């Protein structure tokens, strides 16, 4: 070997000695000397080679590892080099206690053993034989470092508010190589995680972070989620887990027992709740008002009808919030009014709408009826009356019925603005010689403007006139006008009294007769005193009397018929009633008396009985027709002429009948007088009224004015009443166009000597035209 090579070798040992911290120069010199001597001996022809060289190895941190180095028959020094630096000479590696040179030295084995591999052992190693001047190939020792235990941020229990998504972060640090992280739930891998790696300062280790997002629908309370980190150092990996704690406000269930329940019975409310975190408070309320006596899960109370519509609420509170739940109770109760119906005031012909609202449980039925009637008008909350009439006025009832529970009703009043309605008794009674009263009851909305009593030629509205006094009293039902007559005489029982009321909608009239009370009472008492046999006897006697009268009437009629055929100047009629119409000067006192007698006779004979009037009208028509067709049977003794009378009677005037606004079916009786003169008299006293007048039959004139009428034949109980109908024009006896027979003075004188009835004018004005007089012969 060349000398410079030896110098280089000595220099290496010097440097090595400094690396080992050898400070004694003498030691190095001795080593150098020894090596030089040994080298000389080895260089004398001996050749050495490696039988074993170090190989690349991978070791997990903390595990032992051995790097092989064997040189057969070499007993010199062996030097182990780590990343270019000598670890020590020979077997002395005291500076690295984790390193040992092992093997049989005599056999040339110089293995390097690392007792516990660490990250700093990760390097390139060489084995060198100094005296033999050989070195091994470099060997790579790779040290694997497992990751630290993975950590899930926020673990081991992660609290999550219900409805929020879950974000988990797991990191595994200080791994070589970098760890791999997977997420597991119930043993299954959860995909969708994201990763990030970070290289540490040593340039060998790495840290990894994984983030997992889970939607709210995939998260369950109490679920465990695992983070597992693995690398080559730990194939089984390391893992950690977290438990999901889903927190939520209370979940409340409110129950009521028993249901359904009758009113005034006890029920129990049970408020059960699940909450995370735990419940801290219960609060009960009804219709927003706190129930102070209830504070726990249960609330017992006695229910009434309000619990059906006003719910009871239970509010449960925990750290996250409150939950409120309400329940009504299926309470059975009778009808309760929620909207009161209102009484109405409407005009005639308008619509009336009533409304009432009820509640009840179970479902109720509503019925509208008019008080006193069994007719159901409506089953709805609303009752509508179209085009109301006066007879629609009255009390209406809204009735509600809850089956098997109860019923209720409300009453309202319908008031109809219209003409007055008089509903007095048409026949009233009084005692002869005593004070008597005739009452006229008037229903009127609006109240009557005027009430007047009229009889004969008298009209009285209020106050006293002679024996007569009028008083008017207002009551809740209507107005009562009373005509009081003092010291009643017989003529008062033969007088027709007229009560008339007016308001802005029209008028109404009632005809009232006064009957003697004593005679009827005596007659009634006599009948009651009679026994049954006496009644039988009277019946037989009456029957016999009637039969006798019928027989006599037949004989008389037969005889009269024979005798009348011989009379001159008389025309025969079908009903054996002869009518003579003559002209006569008025103003006779006797005629006035006769006229009064006729009126009295007509009243005494049934108060204008319908049958008699009908017969007289028919006879008049038939006789007038026959008069027109007859020839003069007296050969000129009587002058038969037709004429036209253009002058109407001034004392009685019938205006065209106007439509009657009064309720139909009301019966009327002729008043026996003209209101034209009455109201003319009233107007002279400064009272201005413009009321349409309707009159039935005038009896204060020599003419009989007849308005076309329809007799109500079904109401025979009151023979003096008949129904007013429309009249197109004024009709009087002087306005007829039929022919009449005019008798001369002689014939009138002879005719007046026979049995007849006369009618004269109320007025005795001699300037008035001749009036015709109706004479009836039987």
From Swiss-Prot:
Q: How does it sit in the membrane?
A: Single-pass type I membrane protein
Q: Where is the Ig-like C2-type domain?
A: 48-142, 147-243, 249-330, 335-415, 419-515
Name the residues that span the membrane. Answer: 536-556
Q: Which residues are glycosylated?
A: 167, 253, 324, 498
GO molecular-function terms, A-Z: PDZ domain binding
- Signal peptide segment: 1-21
Disulphide bridges, residue numbers: 69-127, 170-227, 271-314, 356-398, 440-499
InterPro entries, per this entry?
CD80_C2-set, Cell_adhesion_signaling, Ig-like_dom, Ig-like_dom_sf, Ig-like_fold, Ig_I-set, Ig_sub, Ig_sub2
Q: According to the UniProt topology, which residue ranges lie Extracellular?
A: 22-535
GO cellular component labels = axon; dendrite; dendritic shaft; extracellular region; membrane; plasma membrane; synaptic vesicle
Checking SUPFAM superfamilies in the record gives:
Immunoglobulin (SSF48726)
Query: Which residue stretches belong to region Disordered?
Result: 727-778
Keyword set, alphabetical order: Cell adhesion, Cell membrane, Cell projection, Disulfide bond, Glycoprotein, Immunoglobulin domain, Membrane, Repeat, Secreted, Signal, Transmembrane, Transmembrane helix
Annotated tissue distribution: Expressed mainly in adult brain, bone marrow and stromal cells. Expressed in diverse regions of the brain, including the cortex, hippocampus, striatum, olfactory bulb and cerebellum. In brain, expressed in pontine nucleus neurons (at protein level). In hippocampus, produced in both the dentate granule neurons and the GABAergic neurons, but not the CA3 neurons. Expressed in subpopulations of vomeronasal sensory neurons. Expressed in a subset of neurons in dorsal root ganglia.
Q: Where is the composition biased (Polar residues)?
A: 727-736
Task: Note the Pfam families from the entry.
Answer: C2-set_2, I-set, Ig_3
Q: Where in the cell is it found?
A: Cell membrane; Cell projection, Axon; Cell projection, Dendrite
| Topology Cytoplasmic: residue spans | 557-778
Posttranslational modification, per the record? Undergoes proteolysis by a metalloprotease and gives rise to a soluble form.
In this chain, composition skew of type Low complexity spans 748-762
Q: What does the entry give for GO biological process?
A: glomerulus morphogenesis; hemopoiesis; hippocampus development; homophilic cell adhesion via plasma membrane adhesion molecules; inter-male aggressive behavior; neuron migration; neuron projection morphogenesis; principal sensory nucleus of trigeminal nerve development
Q: How does it assemble?
A: Homodimer; mediates homophilic interactions to promote cell adhesion. Interacts with NPHS1; forms heterodimers with NPHS1. Interacts with NPHS2/podocin (via the C-terminus). Interacts with CASK. Interacts (via extracellular region) with MAP1B. Interacts (via extracellular region) with MYO16. Interacts (via intracellular region) with ATP1B1. Interacts (via intracellular region) with SHMT2. Interacts (via intracellular region) with UFC1.
Family, per entry:
Belongs to the immunoglobulin superfamily.
Q: What is this protein called?
A: Kin of IRRE-like protein 3
Gene that produces this protein:
Kirrel3
């Amino acid at each position: 070997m060349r000398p410079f090579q030896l110098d280089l070798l000595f220099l290496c040992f010097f440097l090595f000695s400094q690396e080992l911290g050898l400070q004694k120069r003498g030691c190095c010199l001795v080593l150098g000397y020894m090596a030089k001597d040994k080298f000389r001996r080895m260089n004398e022809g001996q050749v050495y080679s490696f039988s074993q060289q170090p190989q690349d190895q991978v070791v997990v941190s903390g595990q032992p590892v051995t790097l092989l180095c064997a040189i057969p028959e070499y007993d010199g020094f062996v030097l182990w080099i780590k990343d270019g630096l000598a670890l020590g000479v020979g077997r002395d590696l005291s500076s690295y206690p984790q390193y040992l040179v092992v093997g049989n030295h005599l056999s040339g084995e110089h293995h390097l053993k690392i007792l516990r591999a660490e990250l700093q052992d990760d390097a390139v190693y060489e084995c060198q034989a100094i005296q033999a001047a050989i070195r091994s190939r470099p060997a790579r020792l790779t040290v694997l470092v497992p990751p630290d235990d993975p950590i899930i941020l926020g673990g081991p229990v992660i609290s999550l508010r219900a409805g929020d998504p879950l974000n988990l972060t797991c990191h595994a640090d200080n791994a070589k190589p970098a760890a791999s992280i997977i997420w597991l739930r119930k043993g299954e891998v959860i995909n969708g995680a994201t990763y990030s790696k970070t290289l540490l300062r040593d340039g060998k280790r790495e840290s990894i972070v994984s983030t997992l997002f889970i939607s709210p629908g995939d998260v369950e309370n109490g679920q465990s989620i695992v983070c597992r980190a693995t690398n080559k150092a730990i194939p089984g990996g390391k893992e950690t887990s977290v438990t999901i704690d889903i927190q939520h406000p209370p979940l409340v269930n409110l129950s009521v027992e028993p249901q359904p329940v009758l009113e005034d019975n006890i029920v129990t409310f049970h408020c059960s709740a699940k909450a995370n975190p735990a419940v801290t408070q219960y609060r009960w309320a009804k219709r927003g008002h706190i129930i102070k006596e209830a504070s726990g899960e249960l609330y017992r109370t006695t229910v009434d009808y309000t619990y059906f519509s006003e719910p009871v609420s239970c509010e449960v509170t925990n750290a996250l919030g409150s939950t409120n739940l309400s329940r009504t109770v299926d309470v059975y109760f009778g009808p309760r009014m929620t909207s009161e119906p209102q009484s109405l005031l409407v005009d005639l012909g308008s619509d009336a709408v009533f409304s009432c609202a009820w509640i009840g449980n179970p479902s109720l039925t509503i019925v509208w009826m008019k008080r006193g009637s069994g007719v159901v008008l409506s089953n709805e909350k609303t009752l509508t009356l179209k085009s109301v009439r006066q007879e629609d006025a009255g009390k209406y009832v809204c009735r509600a019925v809850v089956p098997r529970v109860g019923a209720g009703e409300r009453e309202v009043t319908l008031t109809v603005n219209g003409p007055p309605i008089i509903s007095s008794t048409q026949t009233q009674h009084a005692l002869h010689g005593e004070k008597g009263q005739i009452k006229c009851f008037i229903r009127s909305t609006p109240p009557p403007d005027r009430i007047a009593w009229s009889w004969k030629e008298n009209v009285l509205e209020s106050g006293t006139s002679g024996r007569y006094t009028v008083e008017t009293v207002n009551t809740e039902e209507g107005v009562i006008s009373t005509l009081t007559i003092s010291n009643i005489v017989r003529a008062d029982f033969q007088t027709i009294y007229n009560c008339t009321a007016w308001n802005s909608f029209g008028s109404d009239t009632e005809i009232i007769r006064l009957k003697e009370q004593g005679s009827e009472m005596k007659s009634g008492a006599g009948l009651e005193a009679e026994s049954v046999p006496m009644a039988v006897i009277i019946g037989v006697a009456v029957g016999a009397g009637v039969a006798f009268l019928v027989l006599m009437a037949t004989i008389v009629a037969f005889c009269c018929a024979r005798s009348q055929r011989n009379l001159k100047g008389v025309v025969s009629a079908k009903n054996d009633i002869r009518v003579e119409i003559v002209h006569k000067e008025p103003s006779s006192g006797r005629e006035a008396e006769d006229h009064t007698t006729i009126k009295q006779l007509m009243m005494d004979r049934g108060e204008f009985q319908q049958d008699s009037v009908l017969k007289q009208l028919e006879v008049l028509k038939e006789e007038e027709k026959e008069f027109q067709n007859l020839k003069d049977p007296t050969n000129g003794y009587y002058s038969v002429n037709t004429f036209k009378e253009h002058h109407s009677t001034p004392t009685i005037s019938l205006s065209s009948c106007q439509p009657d606004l009064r309720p139909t079916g009301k019966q009327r009786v002729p008043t026996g007088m003209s209101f034209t003169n009455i109201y003319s008299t009233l107007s002279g006293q400064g009272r201005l009224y413009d009321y349409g007048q309707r009159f039935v039959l005038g009896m204060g004139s020599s003419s009989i004015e007849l308005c076309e009428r329809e007799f109500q034949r079904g109401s025979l109980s009151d023979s003096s009443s008949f129904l007013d109908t429309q009249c197109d024009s004024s009709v009087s006896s002087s306005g007829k166009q039929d022919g009449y027979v005019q008798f001369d003075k002689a014939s009138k004188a002879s005719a007046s000597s026979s049995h007849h009835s006369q009618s004269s004018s109320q007025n005795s004005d001699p300037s008035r035209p001749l009036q015709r007089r109706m004479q009836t012969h039987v």
